[in-house]
Amino acid sequence: MAQTHSFNGRKRVRKFFGKIPEVAEMPNLIEVQKASYDQFLMVEEPSGGRPDEGLQAVFKSVFPIQDFSGASMLEFVRYEFDPPKFDVDECRQRDLTYSAPLKVTLRLIVFDIDEDTGAKSIKDIKEQDVYMGDMPLMTDNGTFIVNGTERVIVSQMHRSPGVFFDHDKGKTHSSGKLLFAARVIPYRGSWLDIEFDSKDIVYARIDRRRKLPATTLLMALGMDGEEILSTFYKTVTYTRDGDNWRIPYSAERFKGMKIISDLVDADTGEVVLEAGKKLTARAAKQLAEKGLKAIKATEDDLFGSYLAEDVVNYATGEIYLEAGDEIDEKVLKTLIDTGETEINVLDIDHVNIGAYIRNTLAVDKNESRQEALFDIYRVMRPGEPPTMDSAEAMFHSLFFDSERYDLSAVGRVKMNMRLDLDAEDTVRVLRKEDILAVVKMLVELRDGRGEIDDIDNLGNRRVRSVGELMENQYRVGLLRMERAIKERMSSIEIDTVMPQDLINAKPAAAAVREFFGSSQLSQFMDQTNPLSEITHKRRLSALGPGGLTRERAGFEVRDVHPTHYGRICPIETPEGPNIGLINSLATFARVNKYGFIESPYRKVVDGKVTNDVVYLSAMEEAKHSVAQANVELDEQGGFVDEFVICRHAGEVMMAPRENVDLMDVSPKQLVSVAAALIPFLENDDANRALMGSNMQRQAVPLVRAEAPFVGTGMEPIVARDSGAAIAARRGGIVDQVDATRIVIRATEELDPSKSGVDIYRLQKFQRSNQSTCINQRPLVRVGDRIHKGDIIADGPSTDLGDLALGRNVLVAFMPWNGYNYEDSILLSEKIVSDDVFTSIHIEEFEVAARDTKLGPEEITRDIPNVSEEALKNLDEAGIVYIGAEVHPGDILVGKITPKGESPMTPEEKLLRAIFGEKASDVRDTSMRMPPGTYGTVVEVRVFNRHGVEKDERAMAIEREEIERLAKDRDDEQAILDRNVYGRLADMIDGKVAAAGPKGFKKGTTITRELMTEYPRSQWWQFAVEDEKLQGELEALRSQYDDSKKLLEARFMDKVEKVQRGDEMPPGVMKMVKVFVAVKRKIQPGDKMAGRHGNKGVVSRILPVEDMPFLEDGTHADIVLNPLGVPSRMNVGQILETHLGWACAGMGKKIGELLDVYRKTANIEPLRQTLEHIYPDNDRNEPVRSYDDDAILMLANQVKRGVSIATPVFDGAVEADINAMLTDAGLATSGQSTLYDGRTGEPFDRQVTMGYIYMLKLHHLVDDKIHARSIGPYSLVTQQPLGGKAQFGGQRFGEMEVWALEAYGAAYTLQEMLTVKSDDVAGRTKVYEAIVRGDDTFEAGIPESFNVLVKEMRSLGLNVELDDTREAEQPALPDAAE
């Protein structure tokens, strides 16, 4: 077993602490997006045999379209996609949408209609391909490129179609009575509500409109009163027996009743039960067994019953009494008078069976189907007079027309399950049986039988992913189109047109564009780091069109539900108004074809846990008992304990092991990806875990990524599935590597029709949506052998194929002079100087030269009134050089705009004529660096409109691009040649030649020496005598020629795209994009966090020598406040600190053994230590089978710290941490004596010290700090704008005014409210005074006062400001007068 597992140093090796084996493979993390959209487009399916779903279903549902007269019909045949015009990178660069043209084949059939018989015969059939706009395609990473930016379509959670029963929880009526209601929700169409009111009458509502008695709806379905009653109630027959009546006795009916008068056997006359006693269920059953058939009833017992059928005089046809009438003395007399001896009564006892439907029928004014239909028509279309036809058509179209009403397959399945029906799932409209079943079930609920539905159960909520959302949107577009097509078919001469002339595809294309551009669910991708991308694609939102709104969503919808287990993460959700409405899919969850979330379970057969995995939705899981993943099992897979903790029907309980039939697959199946990345999650408080999982998404990719010492084993999965790290598509040998690409010669999965070369282009310093930097680095060397799935390049925030969002830093938990008060963080200067938390951010600046009314704008270096110094970074075309260092206010692109001619004085005209002065008619509108930004120009792109002459800069960029493409082509060609000629040489070596190149003797044996005498291109001239081989040679040749042609064609196509002008928005002649990169070191004011919700702001950066240090002189990197732990209850960070300390200790030990090896060449101690760290089990690397080179590689990898994995809920326990600390030769307390860096004295107590994984978050002080002297003002109030984006000022608000008032600082207050704010004249004067060096000013009237006066005038109050102050007061009258 010497070298079965090759270790090439290209992956991070982790020591696993998990004890539970991984049985099921975790599904691909972005499967949700990709599978859904693939199912919608079905690009791979042959166009003839596509199943009826996705796009195919949309076309099938709208077509065929008939014109109004039925003389012609437009049918859908199939659809196809042409290859996309631009690839993903080109679309990103040119601000285009990555999409493929959709071609639909339509068939127009024209009929001849016989005027006499009305019979149709086909006159003409025309088929044609019609272009139906572009359909956006999904990239390999599950995103869409729309107008050059990457977007994600978030999946939506909504209420599943079907029927739901609920009550108002007693809130509607003051008595607190429960009012039950049923609601039938279709996928599309009208909602049907059936509800009780406080008087127990059953009402129906259609589309939340005015309510109607439910019996009206039943009558409209064609039932009459008697039929309705017989459907809902059983009947009891009272038989006349002398003066008394007999009632048949049934135990069911009488059990539980309190007997008012004696129960008398009608046959024997004996009293079987005295009055006042209660008839228990047991006693009732015993009476029946004794042979009690009927009991005596008096006339009083009949009163209050209801007739089950009409009482009719058959001779005259007169109806004496109607079904449902209540029996009183008068009715009874009528019955006796008519000579009835048997009366059929409805079986209503007001206890088990209520008279709700009978009472509703009594309230209902409608007597017939026509009246009922008219009533429904009046509610749905108020103000229109109903006719029988229109009412019938309208009622039919509400629930029974598949065009207007669709329950969807899900809705039908759910309805069948809830109501015990057995309709096919192709029946997608309502039936009479369905409506009756709903009303019956509702009445049962009111009678106290059955359960209401829980709408927050995941069995009643489903996920609409990209494909389905897109399908609905496209259907809307096609339906808009359908109207236009119908009108056009009727209005033009149908014989002469082709399908193309009938179709205007704009509405369909517009619907798609609108969805991707402005839907609430189409979001700008969060691309801060690979984790945030993956989380964004796995997000589930309850908001959006057809979903909830933040204001209306109550507590229950947001709460965690038992069915979330293994489906939706209970931890990861935003803080704030969206809490619980936006969720994340759990790690192992997947969405089934009906849109329900499924979670995997292991089957338990005969008490033994098998490795059989089944995926179940919440509905299917309800009937099982599910054990947890960490239940103790014996060797055979049986449960060790007699009683096992398990989940059953939403409750957690102890169940005997025989009853358990399923078991969780993995402990991490209940949390999301982000939460599964937090080690010791089980020791953190849920609120802090929520913050931790949310903050990991905000971590900025650092210049040097470093994987955590303490991980969870999820890191490589996230890095691979997010597409940040590049995995090999197939095995092979590395042929070439440089920073921008990797070329691999394939040796596995060789397909003769495809190239034998895989070229992987790496992204270099690209800007992400959040301005972070995307940069990939190769991990392989030339000559390496690669297997499929190996990581060959690291991306942003990945390290050897592991997700690496932050850095491992040495932390001490202790207060330090108040600098870590209130979660502040004290950092060592070493962290800044070593660029530990340095990140690169790339800003994009764009400038466009437009064609204005006064003439075109121009991008140029010749700008009026600008010094040569300011132009030093611009080339002759006026565009900044790559590599230039730019600062706030520097010109990036020089641009001038023509300005309107102002009338010139004669002197100006003369000067203009003499000096030819041109500068006066243009103004400088150059693109300058905004305040507070600086950096280095890393890339410039120039786009020109078709037909506009290119400047020198654009030509240079173009040449560079073409050179790069040519290099790619040449490399691919070289590898192709090597491959093909190698195979050719193998095939003909040692064969007898039948012919050959010029001067070659026939019949000679071909050898490799002989071949070298001829140039390779002449080898094809060798012909061999073996005909079969000759055929193979010819096949190889034609394949080689095809590959060469394909390569050349691809190259020419790309060159043509580069040289061709760009598509620009209207009015734009030329566009320049400048990318500026800035290196941001960490500084006070930046936000940092650990993975446990322990966040803080950097308060001070201390010189290294002042930081606390250990006995061996190692200084702490970071000092955190220990008071941040106890109240927050995120103890995980302390366990991580200890374990990180042990990892670093082990690393140090291995480093020492490496030094020993270098001196003595004895590798054994090193091998033994590594084998001890990685014991042989199925989770750890098989270090025992490593050869010496691999051992040295591994030792070099782990000498800074051994990486370990502690999976969530199955991680390292205290004993493991102690053992590892002991192995590393450290104290098991995890504490050390620290010395004060300023005095050199030891601190009084030992301090917890260790390694924590810290992240730098995307809340950087550079983006927030902002100052303004003068800037823009609001138009109306003339006050400065607010906010950094508007270059606004500080608002001196109401409360601040109170503060100055309280101080009595009148003059300060006056200038705050006037010249420093919105006194326009005053502030100009102050400016002039300051320029003069004068310090006096006079306050005028603030503009906001004028606004107030205007507002009052708009209300009709004429307010005038009287500012005519009397110059002098009138003199006081003399005393004498």
UniProtKB/Swiss-Prot annotation:
Reactions that this protein is recorded to catalyse: RNA(n) + a ribonucleoside 5'-triphosphate = RNA(n+1) + diphosphate
GO cellular-component term (any): DNA-directed RNA polymerase complex
One GO MF term: DNA-directed RNA polymerase activity
Origin: domain of life: Bacteria
PROSITE patterns attached to this UniProt entry: RNA_POL_BETA
Function: DNA-dependent RNA polymerase catalyzes the transcription of DNA into RNA using the four ribonucleoside triphosphates as substrates.
Assembly: The RNAP catalytic core consists of 2 alpha, 1 beta, 1 beta' and 1 omega subunit. When a sigma factor is associated with the core the holoenzyme is formed, which can initiate transcription.
Its EC number(s): 2.7.7.6
Entries under InterPro entries matching the protein: DNA-dir_RNA_pol_bsu_ext_1_sf, DNA-dir_RNA_pol_bsu_external_1, DNA-dir_RNA_pol_su2, DNA-dir_RNAP_su2_dom, DNA-dir_RNAP_su2_hyb_sf, RNA_pol_bsu_bac, RNA_pol_bsu_CS, RNA_pol_bsu_protrusion
First-tier enzyme category under EC: transferase
Record protein name field: DNA-directed RNA polymerase subunit beta
Similarity remark: Belongs to the RNA polymerase beta chain family.
